[in-house]
From Swiss-Prot:
It comes from Arthroderma benhamiae (strain ATCC MYA-4681 / CBS 112371) (Trichophyton mentagrophytes). SUPFAM superfamilies: Protease propeptides/inhibitors, Subtilisin-like. The active site is at 286 (charge relay system), 290 (charge relay system), 501 (charge relay system). Its cofactor is Ca(2+). The gene is SED2. This is Probable tripeptidyl-peptidase SED2.
Amino acid sequence: MRLLKFVCLLASVAAAKPTPGASHKVIEHLDFVPEGWQMVGAADPAAIIDFWLAIERENPEKLYDTIYDVSTPGRAQYGKHLKREELDDLLRPRAETSESIINWLTNGGVNPQHIRDEGDWVRFSTNVKTAETLMNTRFNVFKDNLNSVSKIRTLEYSVPVAISAHVQMIQPTTLFGRQKPQNSLILNPLTKDLESMSVEEFAASQCRSLVTTACLRELYGLGDRVTQARDDNRIGVSGFLEEYAQYRDLELFLSRFEPSAKGFNFSEGLIAGGKNTQGGPGSSTEANLDMQYVVGLSHKAKVTYYSTAGRGPLIPDLSQPSQASNNNEPYLEQLRYLVKLPKNQLPSVLTTSYGDTEQSLPASYTKATCDLFAQLGTMGVSVIFSSGDTGPGSSCQTNDGKNATRFNPIYPASCPFVTSIGGTVGTGPERAVSFSSGGFSDRFPRPQYQDNAVKDYLKILGNQWSGLFDPNGRAFPDIAAQGSNYAVYDKGRMTGVSGTSASAPAMAAIIAQLNDFRLAKGSPVLGFLNPWIYSKGFSGFTDIVDGGSRGCTGYDIYSGLKAKKVPYASWNATKGWDPVTGFGTPNFQALTKVLP
């Protein structure tokens, strides 16, 4: 029976992969049908698919050199962030490169009206039959065995050798979407005594029982400071998975916790069919959490909720075995939208409280989106991400068919061009919260800006957890903030929310306050934060040396499926940088003294 199943599996894989011709080069391939999916038959030749094609840059170092030049204090170009037109010029491929790709598409049968040249990206729509010929592949219908959702995908695709050096990736092809991408969100019921506390009592509590804007202001030294209303200091809040920020809940929150901010609101940026529906039974907790703390801590800043339709492309692993039918790629949709905005419409801070295990995304996809975060950084955007809520890992095993024991880094927190925010709990002193994710990337090498700090930590760590992580990978998180039991109004009622999804918007608001401080003195916004944080800014953060993260318990915390167990798996908070709280939590007054 086992032999028969193995033979059938080989047959299905063979049916999904045509024999590559000598004139074509394979761009991407999967070794097997992802776990939880079954190939059920050939795709309808007339079915239409919308594709993204990322053009491989001839000199990728130009982008990286530029972001470090404008983001590293002491360099001549520091703070001289690019305009959109300057970024376009930096990334624009040679005319003959774009022409060769467009000619390949049109000669292959794609209607020229369905092709959009966006410089370093090309978007095109065509039917399955034409796409199969173009990419020397066979598209099939794959069914999710758990929820019967079907998708048109392939396990491998190629392009002509003549243009292969110019193609970084084409998607959706090998991307199998998820229904519930990992996000940081833990709900806690509130006791009646907490619900009845006054603003003054919350401030005096120093976040010991419930986190509010009042106690964060006290704990992190903001006092009653607010940002000024300026066009050059905007905050963007990312919304995915049909999460909608509710105006009525924000009004209730501000009335209760920030009375001086009553009447302040946010605008909407709706991307790729995104919505921000008010009322109704849909989920809104994450969106409300983000918006209430961003507006509450910096209420005069211009805040935009960027709602993007669609669900992300992931390769199934134990943490997220269920799939979705939406073909949109939300990060790509959002990021391509943002990098095309004029500089005066861009947020100076963008906070996002979503993430996926790094291994569950194809390598080409993580590289392409990480580069887009870098592009935002060159234009002066501080990109903030929550680090995740699984400690060193949840499933703690690889999804490459080997099922090897391995810690699970989180993406985009592991991208070297974002600032990753871990979580703390308690006061006097603050401690690392046990769920705060962190670790070392398996995709991105450690950037030079964090060499010294991470090497110091690795000396302390020694051989502990050897083989379970890549010590040469990009280390995260970078910094941290309170992450346990935030007061949030949702559907008219107050609840408690925990997770690094709470830490990220709180930190974003504090960064906006620092930008406001700099702008008032005639200096530009901070932009990409990490080179400053690791060179000098770290001294403005309170080092967290107590507590630690936990994970790898033998069961995946999201799916409940049995997984690898690593006894006592953890990252401990230590003196200096560590992979659970980074450099620690902000002290606003101290930070203003070490600004570049």
